[in-house]
């Protein structure tokens, strides 16, 4: 058995990733979800979590397990994913990574940077610095402790600014001095990219948003607000949720404005996803419907070689 053999299936939002899985035989594979918002509990509709029927058909991992107030990082995902792959292999099944978070796929394929994990105490400390002293202070501090990293970063990339300082405060070593990446844990990967025309994606995104509204998205949003979730809640960074923060804070934004904004942001996100995915090598690009038989044959080929 080739323990490091895995399958990647990725593509932009609304391309039709989940539909393919219904065609996969039961008990042949398990899915490792690659989505930074679907991990959160309670944030169900706009995140387009896999349906109960799909999760009954094929077991899914890393879906609907995390408190919405907690951060979810690439480091946490990577560590969890490696553990789950081993568990799936022990069951003689195929581990299939499915999702749209391109950054996660990149590190699964190329290897994860060997920077250390950071304690919650350090994260809270850096967040407090940001809240009390502002981004300009963090930039000044980063320039002092790690000028190499400072010159590399987009000065509006607050996530990486915070991450750089967290690593320094945790270890006393600039993040720029750590090895940039290690070798991938996976040596044999079948990579399937799903594609559609942008016009087709645009139509499907619009249909999906209407389906979300019909499924009770507004009630879900109101329920989340009533529980105290707000702009500081990590789960609210997702498209389809973040836009409703405007609805709450600025009465001039009507529901139609918010829906239009979700449509716009979703399509722009799909374009960014495709741009990022295009940088990943060794991808076989296929249409989720026209090439369905080819997709299933590729996966069954892996099955036969195990």
UniProtKB/Swiss-Prot annotation:
Substrate binds at residues 13-18. The record marks 101, 123 as: Interaction with substrate tRNA. NCBIfam families: miaA. PANTHER family: TRNA DIMETHYLALLYLTRANSFERASE. GO terms for molecular function: ATP binding; tRNA dimethylallyltransferase activity. Monomer. Keywords: ATP-binding, Magnesium, Nucleotide-binding, Transferase, tRNA processing. Pfam families: IPPT. It comes from the Bacteria. Its EC number is 2.5.1.75. One of its GO terms (biological process) is tRNA modification. It is an enzyme of class 2 (transferase). ATP binds at residues 11-18. Residues 35-38 are annotated as: Interaction with substrate tRNA. It catalyses: adenosine(37) in tRNA + dimethylallyl diphosphate = N(6)-dimethylallyladenosine(37) in tRNA + diphosphate. Catalyzes the transfer of a dimethylallyl group onto the adenine at position 37 in tRNAs that read codons beginning with uridine, leading to the formation of N6-(dimethylallyl)adenosine (i(6)A). Its cofactor is Mg(2+). Belongs to the IPP transferase family. This is tRNA dimethylallyltransferase.
């Amino acid at each position: 058995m080739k323990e490091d053999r895995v399958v990647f299936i990725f593509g932009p939002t609304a391309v039709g990733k989940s539909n393919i899985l219904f065609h996969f035989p039961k008990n042949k594979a398990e899915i490792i979800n690659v989505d930074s918002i679907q991990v959160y509990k309670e944030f169900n509709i706009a995140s387009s979590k896999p349906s109960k029927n799909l999760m009954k058909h094929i077991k899914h991992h890393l879906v609907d397990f995390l408190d919405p107030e907690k951060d979810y990082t690439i480091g946490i995902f990577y560590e969890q994913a490696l553990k789950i792959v081993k568990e799936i292999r022990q069951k003689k099944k195929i581990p299939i990574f499915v999702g749209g978070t391109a950054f996660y796929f990149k590190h699964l394929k190329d290897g994860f940077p060997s920077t250390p994990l950071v304690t919650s105490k350090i994260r809270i400390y850096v967040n407090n610095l940001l809240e009390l002293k502002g981004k300009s202070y963090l930039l000044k501090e980063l320039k002092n402790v790690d000028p190499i990293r400072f010159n590399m970063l987009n000065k509006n990339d607050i996530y990486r600014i915070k991450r750089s300082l967290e690593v320094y405060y945790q270890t006393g070593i600039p993040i720029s001095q750590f090895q940039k990446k290690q070798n991938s844990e996976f040596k044999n990967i079948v990579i399937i990219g799903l594609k559609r025309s942008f016009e087709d994606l645009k139509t499907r995104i619009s249909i999906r948003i209407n389906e979300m509204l019909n499924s009770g998205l507004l009630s879900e949003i109101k329920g989340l607000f009533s529980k105290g979730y707000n702009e500081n809640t990590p789960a609210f960074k997702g498209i389809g949720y973040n836009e409703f923060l405007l609805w709450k804070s600025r009465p001039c934004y009507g529901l139609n404005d918010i829906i239009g904004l979700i449509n716009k942001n979703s399509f722009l996100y799909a374009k960014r996803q495709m741009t990022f995915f295009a940088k990943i090598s060794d991808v076989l690009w296929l249409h989720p419907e026209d090439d369905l038989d080819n997709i299933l044959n590729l996966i069954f080929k892996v099955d036969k070689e195990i």
